[in-house]
Design a protein with these regions (language model features):
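Bacterial Sec-dependent N-terminal signal peptides
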Residues: 1-25, 470, 488, 516-518
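A non-transmembrane, solvent-exposed segment enriched in polar/low-complexity residues
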Residues: 20-168, 175-212
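Structural micro-motif
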Residues: 66-68, 413-416, 450-459
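Thiol/disulfide oxidoreductase modules built on the thioredoxin-like
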Residues: 179, 427-483
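Long amphipathic alpha-helical scaffold segments
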Residues: 271-280, 286-337
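N-terminal "domain-start" segment that seeds a small globular fold
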Residues: 309-348, 423, 480-482, 486-489, ...
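Short active-site neighborhood of thiol/selenol oxidoreductases, capturing the structured segment around
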Residues: 345-375, 389-391
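Structural microenvironment flanking redox-active thiols in thiol-disulfide oxidoreductases
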Residues: 370-411, 419-429, 442-445
């Protein structure tokens, strides 16, 4: 008897797990192919197809993981629904107004989902109208309208909280909770009404940003909501944009995820998103975040990136190692290279200056030909008298050697000019050991040491040869060194606004690439 009851329970459980019919009726729809699309972050990907008949169509929900989905009909129209391992039965009354005509016949998630959509649509219209009115007002009327706008904001948060609390055990509840902003309390004040902690609001916002978000539930990455929340947290709307702050909270966030468990989708999505964001960031110094992510979740004993091939993982770690050499705040790798006579070897660390401009260039690079003469003008008119030196490393192998020497002479470059000359290069290729009495391997391999895959590249080093700034345009270089040396108000010889003095970022189209892999 006990065996029979146990078997009966198992059969019921098996039946309930397979009974996930996703059924839809679309009035007026011709018999055609219909697509099921699933979200991964903000993007939709095709997941299944069925043929509709008399406007009726059905997918097998047991084949698809929980998340937010879309039914795509011809004419590139679609409507969304929540899949949370329950039967779904929905009817679209008008293909030209699918949200407004939607009737949810079966599915607790989707009844609340469409109530939420209609609520937010109404609130958005109300808010937009008030904002338009606000821009046309002034004085007391403007202040009053601002209070009304804030009241609408509170109404939105109140409505969201009501829907969330009513659906805590459903996935729609999770989606709504992720959409909500942090409800900020008033900061502490003294008896005179003065705020006693100016950082209270920011700290509270950051510390409570992820409250009630199930970071071990893979379904959250199959909505655009988690992606948007993640993006906001790591933007200026969230964290202070300082590398050490970002790495601190990246680790705090990821450590809440079960990354020892392979196939953890939230961990994969989060780590990949943060890593990619800061690897490609054009904000100076943010490459430190990329290196931090590589060290903590991709490389060596910390390699938890189960989704990456060994080859791609190795490439990422090699990239991190290259960047590591030139991170802002680190000591610059020492360079000892010969001048154009090939007789005098100059050590970058023996350059006595308050600031050193480290400049990598190529005599045949178009952008370098514009930048280098400007650098000489700055050296003559500003840098020399302020104890700022330029340590210039030119491309001097092969035919570039004569071009390099010719360019130095014709343009009367009086700052330090060194390069890896052809004879030194040949000797290094044959047997570098004799050269190591004069120089170092990192000097002979300076393009790898400093990750020079395009030119020109400009760094600013302090008196201790620590990297303070990098990837600068000529206009940025002038402005920064004016500021650092107390000449903020000096007339700019090369204003940043002039496109000719634009960025030398290696990811833009100005720099000339030398064939090194990214």
């Amino acid at each position: 008897m006990r065996k029979f009851i146990l078997l009966f329970i198992i059969l019921i459980a098996a039946g309930s797990s397979s009974a996930q019919k996703l059924h839809f009726n679309v009035k007026g729809l011709s018999d055609t192919t219909i697509f099921l699309a699933k979200y991964l972050g903000p993007k939709l990907y095709y997941a299944d197809t069925v043929l509709s008949k008399n406007g009726s169509l059905e997918f097998d929900g047991s084949k698809h993981p929980r998340g937010l989905y879309a039914v795509v009909i011809p004419g590139v129209k679609y409507f969304e629904f929540v899949h949370d391992n329950e039967d779904v039965d929905m009817t679209v009354g008008d293909v030209n107004d699918m949200v407004g005509s939607m009737k949810v016949d079966k599915s607790k998630n989707n009844k609340s989902f469409y109530e939420y959509i209609l609520f937010m649509t109404e609130m958005k219209k109300k808010s937009q109208k008030m904002n338009q009115e606000y821009t046309k007002l002034s004085g007391d009327a403007k202040d009053k309208k601002l209070e009304e706008i804030r009241a609408v904001g509170k109404e939105i948060m109140s409505g969201q909280m009501e829907i969330y609390k009513a659906n805590k055990d459903l996935f729609i509840g999770t989606m709504v909770r992720m959409s909500m902003d942090v409800d900020l309390p008033e900061p502490p004040k003294d008896k005179d009404g003065n705020i006693t902690d100016s950082n209270f609001v920011y700290n509270y916002y950051i510390e409570h940003f992820w409250d009630d978000i199930p970071l071990k539930d893979d379904a959250i990455v199959r909505t655009p909501v988690y992606h948007n929340k993640l993006d906001k947290f790591f933007s200026q709307q969230g964290l202070i944009q300082i590398p050490d702050t970002i790495t601190k909270y990246a680790k705090k966030l990821v450590d809440q995820m079960d990354y020892g468990n392979e196939d953890n989708q939230v961990f994969q999505y989060t780590v990949h998103h943060i890593t990619q964001k800061y690897e490609s960031s054009k904000i100076m110094g943010m490459d430190r975040v990329f290196v931090f992510m590589a060290d903590n979740w991709y490389c060596g004993d910390n390699n938890h990136a189960w989704w990456m091939s060994e080859e791609n993982s190795t490439k990422l770690c090699e990239r991190a190692d290259k960047i590591r050499n030139t991170m802002i705040g680190e000591y610059s790798p020492m360079l000892i290279l010969p001048d154009s006579t090939e007789e005098k070897w100059i050590n970058s660390y023996k350059v006595e200056a308050d600031y050193t401009v480290l400049y990598f260039w190529d005599p045949n690079c178009g952008h370098c030909k514009k930048t280098t003469p400007k650098l000489q003008v700055l050296y003559d008119k500003k840098f020399k008298e302020r104890n700022i030196e330029i340590f210039s490393v030119g491309k001097a192998t092969g035919s570039d050697f004569e071009d390099w020497k010719k360019y130095i002479k014709e343009n009367e470059l009086t700052f330090i000019n060194v390069g890896l000359t052809q004879s030194v290069y040949n000797q290094a290729m044959e047997d570098p050991r004799p050269l190591l009495q004069k120089t170092t391997l990192q000097s002979l391999n300076y393009t790898d040491t400093y990750d020079i895959y395009s030119t020109p590249r400009i760094f600013i080093l302090d008196k201790d040869k620590k990297i303070k700034f990098k990837q600068l345009s000529i206009g940025q270089l002038e402005e920064i060194l004016d500021d650092l040396t107390g000449h903020h108000d000096d007339v700019k010889l090369y204003p940043k606004e002039d496109p000719e003095n634009g960025a030398t970022d290696p990811d833009d189209d100005h720099g000339d690439h030398d064939g090194h892999d990214h």
